[in-house]
Amino acid sequence: MFIDNHDVERVASILEDKNQLPLIYTMLFTMPGIPCIYYGSEWGMEGTKNWNDTDLRPEIKVFEWNELTDTIQKLIHLKHNHSALSYGDYTQIGITNTACIYQRQDEKECLWICMNMKNEAQTLGFNGQGNFIDMETNEELCIHNTLEFKPYEVRILKRSSD
């Protein structure tokens, strides 16, 4: 699975709001399939398609480690260490224009991927109750059908009993 390549405009050039880039990469690494990243996109490189595609395939001389690169590194680590993200079943819990919640589950664990794709805070309906662990912060959360999200926030949650 990929979000851009040498034949299409880079995703960073398409998005009006670059704060959505981490959300796209979260989907890439947590949905079924093998994630592929076109060189330079891990840094948020832009490029538009033209008659000879030179903007899509520039020479990269300087490595630009940034916040997006950090996010992708964490997602690679998460996918490598949680079999549900590679082999688990996918269940869509709720998808709207501004939010997305889905589940990845195998025989070992059940992960809930939750995203606020909006530039303002919102409360998302959460079709689940109980104790969960936030995979990024290790914070234990007691959830009762709703969850508060900051703008563009992503949470990957695991039931604490798994």
State where each predicted segment sits.
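Carbohydrate-interacting/catalytic domains
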Residues: 32, 37, 41-162
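Alpha-amylase-like alpha-glycosidases and glucanotransferases acting on alpha-linked glucans and related
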Residues: 1-34, 43, 50, 85, ...
